[in-house]
């Protein structure tokens, strides 16, 4: 799986992974992180998620990273926002109303790009990557987050043999292996009845897991 896979999905309109509402678990659990107003929050593999709008409405400065220029342009167009634009070594930047989106590769971000991110919201990134890429992703992104960062990580847990991802199954054991003491399980919910597309593809069990991520300051 490479960048072209996701670029093709956006070009072909195969974006069933996009939600046309704010993820319900976000307003439920995000306040428990107690991030200060104005804190910069990283949203990796952001797509055109409305979760970014919600985070900005809470007073955060949102930094989203997304490969597809189509997704980025649709995000601002659908919000009716006219973004400022500029270019850097990380990619093309678009910014308006507290949301900055970098159209570029998350693996090109370095500690200079992430040093001001006190928070991270990962709903669609870790589960979008195959197992062979998840360790590299976690090391690259979370390994460069500043000391004392706090994050909310949402994953899915289902029998991977019953369905090809994405989204992929990332269970509690793998999250603990990737993040160690930085990860704390807050919640586990059975959501199979709410996700008929999974059942239609033969999935017999589907849980969503909610983790708090934090690094010692």
UniProtKB/Swiss-Prot annotation:
EC number(s) recorded for this UniProt protein: 2.1.1.67
One GO CC term on file: cytoplasm
Family as reported in the entry's similarity comment: Belongs to the class I-like SAM-binding methyltransferase superfamily. TPMT family.
Pfam families per UniProt: TPMT
Protein name: Thiopurine S-methyltransferase
Enzyme class: transferase
Protein source organism: Bordetella avium (strain 197N)
The reaction(s) this protein catalyses: S-adenosyl-L-methionine + a thiopurine = S-adenosyl-L-homocysteine + a thiopurine S-methylether
DNA-binding as UniProt keyword: no
Subcellular location: Cytoplasm
UniProt keyword annotations, A-Z: Cytoplasm, Methyltransferase, S-adenosyl-L-methionine, Transferase
């Amino acid at each position: 799986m490479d960048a072209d896979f996701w670029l093709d999905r956006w070009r072909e309109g195969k974006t069933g992974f996009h939600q046309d509402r704010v993820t319900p678990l976000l307003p439920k659990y995000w306040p428990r992180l107690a991030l200060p107003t104005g804190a910069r929050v990283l949203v990796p593999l952001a797509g055109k998620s409305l979760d970014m709008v919600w985070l900005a409405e809470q007073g955060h400065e949102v930094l989203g990273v997304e490969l597809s220029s189509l997704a980025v342009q649709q995000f601002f167009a659908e919000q009716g926002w006219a973004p400022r634009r500029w270019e850097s070594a990380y990619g093309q930047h678009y910014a308006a109303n507290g949301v900055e989106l970098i159209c570029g590769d998350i693996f090109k971000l370095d500690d200079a790009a992430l040093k001001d991110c006190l928070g991270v919201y990962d709903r669609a990134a870790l589960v979008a990557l195959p197992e062979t890429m998840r360790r590299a992703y976690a090391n690259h992104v979370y390994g460069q987050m500043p000391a004392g960062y706090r994050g909310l990580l949402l994953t899915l847990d289902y029998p991977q043999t019953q369905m090809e991802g994405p989204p992929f199954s990332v269970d509690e054991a793998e999250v603990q292996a990737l993040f160690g003491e930085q990860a704390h399980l807050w919640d586990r919910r059975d959501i199979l009845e709410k996700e008929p597309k999974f059942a239609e593809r033969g999935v017999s069990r589907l849980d969503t897991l909610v983790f708090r991520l934090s690094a010692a300051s």
